Swiss-Prot record:
The gene is thrB. Gene3D superfamilies: 3.90.1200.10, Phosphorylase Kinase, domain 1. InterPro entries: Aminoglycoside_PTrfase, Homoserine_kinase_II, Kinase-like_dom_sf, Pseudomonas-type_ThrB. The keyword Ligase does not apply. Its EC number is 2.7.1.39. The keyword Protein transport does not apply. This is Homoserine kinase. It is an enzyme of class 2 (transferase). It comes from Burkholderia ambifaria (strain ATCC BAA-244 / DSM 16087 / CCUG 44356 / LMG 19182 / AMMD) (Burkholderia cepacia (strain AMMD)). It catalyses: L-homoserine + ATP = O-phospho-L-homoserine + ADP + H(+).
Length: 332
């Protein structure tokens, strides 16, 4: 993501002594994103990503790294953390937790079509089912308690109309989260940030009947245990929208949701609260983007996202949300 912590050549040389990855050939910061310091790392053994965790603690980090290993062992394409010479999956770099993971093949698809959405929907459902027997627990750290804590810090910066929406939606979500239906929603480990730039695609092999192949999901450092429907809503709110207006692209949304259902059908409570969860997914990112925009941290290559994008999506979801598709017809 953005580079908050710089790494010199001597820093890197010292760090790499703890890994058996060969000689360093190339190393550069990744400017996108706003949470961690990420670097592309190429050695004589392969291509990797070095991440310095700016907020996550050493106590929290095993949930994320072990989750990636667990998912990989269940056939979900994710980055694989590389053990150090002492067997640990992370160490300290400039006093902060840091890890090296394998770099996935492919490139992000920032203008996805139907086939991309089908691939994402099916793999997201596989991820959810694969996580059912994951032993560690970590709540989604950007859920209702975080909203309650940080909305008061944001409201002095926004318009009266935005404040009304922020506070009104917070009350709506608090009531939803307290309901019996919410408690009945299926849950488990979730990615919680499965945007277009966190998924890679490669060209499919000849003769498969597909034009694209899912290369993998990455950036699991917002992951947490949450309702699976929240993860689906976050994904649909990014993969299946008109970026200018926030309006759902019904064809893409239908493709992604039907594909998901071929692996894990939605429950009756999930169907009743699809609109509420789409609103929750939009609200989570509107609040975090407002916070990062008005209360930023210093960084060498910080590029804050536009908060207005998710405000438009939230207003659109409040006004108009189609129901989940009823059929479970396979999409491929």
């Amino acid at each position: 993501m953005a580079v908050f912590t710089a790494v010199s050549d001597s820093d890197l040389a010292q760090w790499m002594r703890h890994y058996e990855l060969g000689d360093v050939l190339a190393f550069r910061g990744i400017p996108s994103g706003i949470e961690n310091s990420n670097f592309f790392l190429t050695t004589t053994r392969g291509e990797y990503v070095l991440t310095i965790f700016e907020k996550l603690t050493a106590e929290q980090l095993p949930f994320y790294l072990d989750l990636m290993r667990h998912l990989a062992s269940h056939g979900v394409p994710v980055p694989d953390p590389i053990p150090r010479d002492d067997g640990a999956l992370f160490g300290l770099l400039h006093g902060k937790p840091a890890a090296i993971v394998t770099k996935l093949d492919g490139a992000a698809e920032l203008a996805p079509g139907i086939e991309h959405c089908i691939e994402v929907g099916q793999m997201l459902a596989r991820l959810h089912l694969a996580g059912r027997d994951y032993a560690r627990y970590q709540p989604n750290l950007r859920s209702l308690p975080w909203w309650r804590e940080n909305v008061p810090a944001i409201v002095p910066f926004v318009s009266d109309a935005q404040r009304t929406l922020l506070e009104g939606e917070l009350a709506h979500q608090a009531a939803f989260f307290a309901s019996d239906d919410y408690a009945a929603l299926p849950s488990g480990p979730c990615h919680c940030d499965l945007f277009r730039d966190n998924v890679l695609f490669a060209h499919a092999a000849p003769g498969t009947g597909h034009d694209v192949r899912l290369g993998g999901f990455f950036d699991f450092y917002f992951a947490g245990c949450d309702k699976w429907l929240f993860d689906v809503a976050v994904t649909v709110n990014d993969w299946c929208v008109d970026l200018a207006t926030g309006v759902l692209d019904v064809a893409r949304a239908d493709a992604l949701l039907r594909a998901y259902q071929t692996v894990r059908p939605f429950t009756a409570p999930e169907r009743r609260h699809w609109s509420d969860m789409l609103r929750a997914g939009a609200y989570r990112f509107w609040v975090s983007r407002l916070y990062d925009f008005y209360l930023p941290r210093a960084a060498e290559m910080l590029k804050p996202h536009d908060p207005g994008h998710f405000e438009r999506i939230l207003r659109e979801r409040i006004a108009n949300t189609p129901a989940l598709p009823e059929t479970h017809t396979a999409c491929n």
